[in-house]
Amino acid sequence: MKDNFTRLQSIVGKQLGIDPSKVKLESDFGRELGADSLDVVELVMAIEDEFEVNIEDQSASQIATVQDVLNYLERN
């Protein structure tokens, strides 16, 4: 089974239409990966589906990087 980072690379790549290999731990969804606010909402929904979690709005608003997502997944 893929590790969480590899799964996230795939999700982000698919949602944003970019090469998953360009998605790094420190990648900022908005500044570096070009995601707008709608993209971020769709990313959160895709992450929730893939990892079977519910990311509350307050938590989602604090997620800016791939590492932030991984940290959230580890805590929940």
UniProtKB/Swiss-Prot annotation:
- Pathway it works in: Lipid metabolism; fatty acid biosynthesis
Q: Where does the protein end up?
A: Plastid, Chloroplast
Q: Which Gene3D superfamilies match?
A: ACP-like (1.10.1200.10)
Residue ranges of the Carrier domain? 2-76
Q: Which residues carry this modification: O-(pantetheine 4'-phosphoryl)serine?
A: 37
> What InterPro entries has UniProt attached to this entry?
ACP, ACP-like_sf, PP-bd_ACP, Ppantetheine_attach_site
| Post-translational events | 4'-phosphopantetheine is transferred from CoA to a specific serine of apo-ACP by AcpS. This modification is essential for activity because fatty acids are bound in thioester linkage to the sulfhydryl of the prosthetic group.
- Give an example GO molecular function: acyl binding
Keywords, A to Z?
A: Chloroplast, Fatty acid biosynthesis, Fatty acid metabolism, Lipid biosynthesis, Lipid metabolism, Phosphopantetheine, Phosphoprotein, Plastid
Q: Which domain of life is it from?
A: Eukaryota
Q: Where are the transmembrane segments?
A: none
**Chief location of this protein?**
plastid
One GO cellular component from the entry? chloroplast
Q: What does this protein do?
A: Carrier of the growing fatty acid chain in fatty acid biosynthesis.
**Protein family (similarity comment):** Belongs to the acyl carrier protein (ACP) family.
Q: What is this protein called?
A: Acyl carrier protein
UniProt organism field: Phaeodactylum tricornutum (strain CCAP 1055/1)
Q: Which gene encodes it?
A: acpP
